[in-house]
């Protein structure tokens, strides 16, 4: 059964800290691979943290092993971004879908 997992990836040995993520070597191949994972429904959310040396992914997969096997196919898997941690994630709040409040016309936040 598919479950949500949070993946933290950290910069690898070929990461150039003087360059932004989009200017790292072999960026087009990595970006294309990751876009494919989004299209396949594997990656739900993802992106770099502010330091751009770490990336967080929320994925939907059957197991940690499946996540590792999938990410090993990334052209950056050992050179630019290595898997640091993979943790199961229980989603309690999900704003990706219309909330019952929005459906009832109560779109403003109760605290803002």
Each language-model region and where it sits:
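Conserved, structured core segments of small domains
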Residues: 1-112
